[in-house]
Regions:
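Soluble FAD-dependent oxygen oxidases
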Residues: 2-5, 13-526
Length: 526
């Protein structure tokens, strides 16, 4: 795997890297030993070692782009350096240096891994005084000769992927926003317009763990750099436990350098946005409940219902994002939604590239996301909005506040699609029945408002949970890619799945590099 590198690299008089890698796959780090530990210790810090080995692939603060991170909380952190590897071998070299450096000077070798930088909470994909491994140069989108799979690099954003696939009449179960990164969405699950048909963005052949309607369900192979620096493939035939774990297990096992995703033929389809005033809220709740729990759910249909508060006028509007992944206008499955009077309607026949750019939230503001999952219930839908109405008055003076609560159907058909595709590590099962996801996305300007916005929003979700318990509609699943820093999505996968993920971590990362030295994300042993 290191055929492009010399057997050793001379670093300022130090033989830093002795790249002799065993030919057999073994995950005992003692058998890897590709790096001279004493040499790394003498260099003094990881950024120096990385700069000497990877040279122009290492950058320092002051020359980094302003839009590296979506949220201001992430952008406010100051890494000591940023590594932008151009291929899997450079990722491997970086990880080997970070692995040894974390033993000798852990205070200077913590690291974070960045794909698109869309997770908003501080430290998710950035690190103070540490190293960011930025995957933006791993941006290949390569369609197989027979057009059944696509090799996608983690440094892509979904808009980049669709720009390649749409002209070929192809699609993958990818993200719905152009600016979201591929790597985090796939390894964390991933909702898609195509999920009712194909499952989540990443599923496996093991029924014990299932994705549902996420991006994780359709990944045939993960190319992964392990903590040892070894590069392996994880699929149904090789390292199948790692394959399953990566379908929802996030950044806990290694750095994925390529996803082989199943592709399928896809024509242009119907989608867009519909904005209505808040007087139609209850009618939309009835439509949402009926749609999500329909025994004849149309797998081509999806919709997201956003409840948006406008602080300046203390008024409400709704924003719908329906899609029907056939070239058909006004399908019956979505009629109860689309018949609601509106003052903005952009519904049209177009493609994923176009639709993914429609709803855009600019970087550079303070952001918060919180999520929960409940069994579908008209009483719960109404309770959510009632609690929301009681919460927002306290936030009226937060500067530049934007508030949106999204409701997303998660019918049992999606878990069934995941089961057909294989499974994953999310713990969802069609026996859970018809569910729906709740996502709060709120944006504001001034850091002084952080405690107010965060405390009120967190309290609101605690009230949601209490009401769900009263109504008997709870579900433990917390979608990792939407979760706030204080939530525990791994626990929501269930004890069996969490134990499985921990076992996989011990096998492929026995030192615990991705648990100890990479503090961002949701860890397995908390």
């Amino acid at each position: 795997m290191f055929k492009h590198w010399p057997s050793a690299i001379l670093l300022g008089g130090l033989w830093l890297l002795c790249l002799t890698v065993p030919g057999t796959a073994s995950f005992n780090e003692d058998t890897q030993a590709p790096i001279s530990e004493s040499a790394v210790a003498k260099v003094g810090n990881c950024c120096t070692a990385l700069s000497l080995v990877l040279q122009n692939s290492v950058q320092y603060p002051g020359i980094l782009p302003d839009d590296m991170y979506w949220s201001l909380q992430e952008a406010e952190l100051h890494p000591s350096c940023v590594v932008t590897p151009s291929n899997r071998d450079e990722v491997s070299l970086a990880i080997q240096i970070l692995h040894l450096g974390s033993k000798y000077f852990p205070d200077r070798c913590e690291f974070a891994v960045r794909s698109g930088g869309h997770t908003p909470w501080a430290g998710a994909a950035n690190v103070e005084a540490g190293v960011v491994v930025d995957l933006q140069r791993l941006n290949q989108v390569i369609i197989s000769a027979v057009k059944t799979t696509v090799n996608v690099g983690p440094g892509n954003r979904w808009g980049d992927v669709y720009n390649v696939l749409d002209p070929q009449g192809l699609a993958v179960t990818g993200g719905r926003l152009a600016t979201v990164g591929v790597g985090g969405l796939v390894t964390g699950g991933g909702f898609s317009h195509f999920s009712p048909r194909y499952g989540l963005v990443n599923t496996t052949q093991h029924r014990i763990i299932e994705c549902g309607k996420f991006a994780c369900d359709t990944v045939d192979n993960f190319e992964v750099v392990l903590a040892s620096g070894q590069i392996v493939n994880a699929n149904a035939r090789s390292n199948s436990d790692l394959w399953r774990a990566l379908r929802g297990g996030s950044n806990n096992f290694g750095i994925v350098t390529a996803f082989t995703m199943r592709s399928f033929s896809q024509s242009d389809y119907w989608g867009g946005s519909i904005i209505s005033d808040g007087t139609h809220m209850d009618k939309l709740f009835r439509a949402f409940e009926s749609f999500t729990s329909s025994p004849t759910y149309d797998p081509y249909a999806t919709n997201i219902l956003n409840l948006i508060w406008q602080p300046a006028t203390d008024s409400w509007i709704t924003l719908q994002s329906p899609s029907y992944t056939k070239k058909q206008v006004g399908p019956p499955a979505l009629e109860k939604f689309t018949s609601v009077p509106s003052f903005v309607n952009t519904m049209r026949i177009s493609n994923s590239s176009d639709f993914s750019k429609e709803l855009y939230s600019a970087p550079g503001q303070r952001q918060l996301m919180i999520t929960a999952t409940f069994q579908i219930s008209m009483a719960m839908l109404r309770a959510i909005h009632t609690i929301e109405l009681q919460t927002v008055p306290a936030l009226r003076n937060a500067s530049g506040l934007q508030w949106s609560l999204a409701l997303q159907p998660q019918p049992a058909i999606i878990s069934q699609a995941s089961a057909r595709a294989g499974g994953n590590s999310l713990g969802l099962d069609d026996s859970d029945g018809d569910l729906f996801n709740v996502l709060l996305t709120t944006t504001w300007v001034d850091k002084k408002d952080d405690p107010l916005v965060e405390s009120q929003s967190r309290r609101m979700f605690e009230q949601f949970q209490a009401e769900a318990e009263r109504l008997g509609v709870t579900n433990p699943y917390v979608y990792l890619n939407y979760a706030a820093s204080w939530q525990d999505p791994i626990r929501g996968y269930g004890d069996v799945n969490k134990a499985f993920l921990q076992d996989v971590s011990r096998k492929y990362d026995p030192y615990g590099l991705f648990q100890k030295a990479a503090p961002g994300g949701f860890k397995l042993f908390n």
